[in-house]
Amino acid sequence: MNLLQICDKVWSQACLSACAPDLEEKLGRPVPSSSVLGTISSYYVQRYGFHPGCQVVAFTGDNPASLAGMRLEEGDIAVSLGTSDTLFLWLREPTPSLEGHIFCNPVDPQHYMALLCFKNGSLMRERIRDESASCSWSEFSKALRATEMGNGGNLGFYFDVMEITPEIIGRHRFNAENCEVSAFPRDVEIRALIEGQFMAKRIHAEGLGYRVMPKTKILATGGASHNRDILQVLADVFDAPVYVTDTANSACVGSAYRAFHGLAAGAAVPFADVVKLAPQPRLAVTPTPGAAQVYEALLPQYAKLEQRILSQTRGPPE
């Protein structure tokens, strides 16, 4: 991937020359990920009993395979809410950035995918739960339901370990007048955490070229995806419905889907048509009416405050 000019789908001659002589000949020509490369090596036939007619479909990495396994479509997002939070994005026009990773789309050669990782995920949520909700997820959820969308203009940044995106550490709280404060009431603290986590995800996704579309849907996985009230905030911030799935090992499932796609005439048949009979995700929540207006006003403010914190911690940009 790092040697590929992803827009032109050819190897970068400058990168090849920097790595090794005659590397292009050794690598071979890049091909669409649905391409059948040939039949399996006789070694695997003799050693492991593969059928000699077994065909090999072009390889991909675990993250692109996960996008295939979750069957994302244009405009969709997958959010893994675990120890670290991870976003998979389907992009039409990427904007490469140091903050995330841009890949060729594994199921549509004309489009792209992006990956964003956030280190302060479930452990940060658990810490605020312990501090502000008596170690109870039930109390945590009650606080989210008791506070209004937008949190009265109170915004928070919660990074107990150095964050990847953005590169900030510490807790920073701002009231509705954009003044930094030392603490929030417990319910406000809980909503500030969850809203802040999801606003950061949307802001940095849009920084890579992502845009929410009318048909956008969000697929949530990971431990926090079992909490409906957390998912409600996610749906409200992105103004898109959130679905959940029981599919585990999405990279393995995606590899199987891709193999099936490759054998079904490859790019001539849309990937979505090949997997349309697979189990569908379940709708968990839909956006609250009026959410779009609330967060359209708050998202730019959150982005400005993030830049303020960054400038205070590492100085103004040159």
Model regions and ranges:
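A conserved helix-loop-beta module that forms one wall/lid of the active-site cleft
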Residues: A20-S35
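Active-site core segments that coordinate phosphate-bearing ligands/cofactors
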Residues: N2-P21, G38, S42-T221, H226-E318
